[in-house]
Amino acid sequence: MSGSRYPAAVDVAIVGSGPTASAYARILSEEAPGASIAMFEVGPTVSNPPGAHVKNIEDPERRSHAQRASEGPGAGAETVNSPGAVKSGERRARPGTYLLQDGYVFPGEDGMPVAAMSSNVGGMAAHWTAACPRPGGTERIPFLPDLEQLLDDADRLLGVTTHAFDGAPFSDLVRERLAAVVDNGRKPAFRVQPMPLAVHRREDAGLVWSGSDVVMGEVTRENPQFDLFDESLVTRVLVEDGVAAGVEVQDRRSGATHRVSARYVVVGGDALRTPQLLWASGIRPDALGRYLNDQAQVVFASRLRGVTDLQGPPAAGGTLSEQSGVAWVPYTDEAPFHGQVMQLDASPVPLAEDDPVVPGSIVGLGLFCAKDLQREDRVAFDNTVHDSYGMPAMRIHYRLTQRDHEILDRAKREIVRLGKAVGEPLVERPFVLPPGASLHYQGTTRMGETDDGESVCSPDSQVWEVPGLFVAGNGVIPTATACNPTLTAVALAVRGARKIAEELTSALLMSESDNRMVK
């Protein structure tokens, strides 16, 4: 392929560069170090090392530029810094993301008016809040006996800790006040506790937020068999004789299209673009794009009572500082929402000029609700209309059921109760964010125990009836969840990557054995 920056053939082609795609690269680098790997990302590299969280960029102007560069076809549109700033009827994306231009709602449906995506190396992990709670109760996938070990592996890859904000002023106080109204009757694992976060501290005590760079790790970056190609749009997965055979990729710099052969293909985009690519490739299992689910989100704010300024250091470009803390109210089947309680540096609503805010005393509360899963909730594709990348246009069909509305009503009452327990509410009533605001879209390439038409892939994430093709990302999660899905999605990616590594290693051993027999 003269003039191409891409290899003619690799062992594994990975589409996407978010946490799950990066988990495949990491596990393969660790467990199949001889395998050649090519990773393709449609967006540009916006941080250093590639995939790093933009919050780690200290210069505000450079950070803003990285966010704009991640917004793909939506670059230049007006954004909002927090989901709670989106008022009813307004469609604005958060920095680093962009919204669907059309097809996000249809008459008689709720739709997903603020469904968003990112196009950059690292995907949304360059912009996320880094919350990594473990699933509980019916959030857990019942047919994976090794799920707990896989979650441990995901913790390792993401660099998860519950100690990032140890010693933050008022964080103990917030948890104590929440626990007083939450913990009764709950098992220890489901009581109020610090939020597990993918973040660590430098030697100078500064915060470093995990992005895909942390998931990849040095073992991937130093792997001579691994290559990352940015500004590269994969337009088709190639299938020969029913088996994955490679990808067709368009170089966004030159416009030229190239074929890269591969023994395995991993499609690790988001829950909207992964099924889009499979559809465009003619790979269309019955469940593809179906069981789409978002987490309805309710937000509220309170102010801590009886606290004084402790004069800590200011924030460095994020909503969290040394005065901050993040408390977690875990999901339970009895209370089917996940609580994320963050101490903020500023009030989300105006306060009196003579009433200065004590840093860390403003508490933002959010409850995420598990969806009532429906087969009819789906992202469909229109072959007659193309999106900004020339791919089949997305058409989202999505409704909140009666049960969803009942859970939302419960969540609204609960968040007010929690807000009053913490302090003085800053607003009269909670605000329900528009569908899509959670950014936690799942189910569109869902995993299943058997090929029964209700799932897209096996417990190893291999697409049914297409050997060698694997899917990754939040879309693989088959259960209704309220907790942040990244940890679970990375755990599932670890399982799939190990399946590929095992097969590659087995094939290598067989080849070496055959060579010895010939000699």
UniProtKB/Swiss-Prot annotation:
Catalytic-site annotation from UniProt: 440
Cofactor: FAD
Basic and acidic residues: bias regions: 55-64
Keywords tagged on the record: FAD, Flavoprotein, Oxidoreductase
Positions bound to FAD: 41, 118, 120, 124, 129, 131, 234, 474, 486
Function in brief: FAD-dependent C-glycoside-metabolizing enzyme that participates in the degradation of certain C-glycosides by catalyzing the oxidation of the hydroxyl group at the C3 position of the sugar moiety. Shows oxidase activity toward various C-glycosides such as isovitexin, isoorientin and mangiferin but cannot use carminic acid, puerarin, orientin or aloesin. Shows weak activity (100 to 1000-fold lower) with O-glycosides. Probably plays a crucial role in the metabolism of C-glycosides in nature.
Protein's name according to its UniProt entry: C-glycoside 3-oxidase
Organism: Arthrobacter globiformis (strain ATCC 8010 / DSM 20124 / JCM 1332 / NBRC 12137 / NCIMB 8907 / NRRL B-2979 / 168)
Taxonomic lineage: Bacteria, Bacillati, Actinomycetota, Actinomycetes, Micrococcales
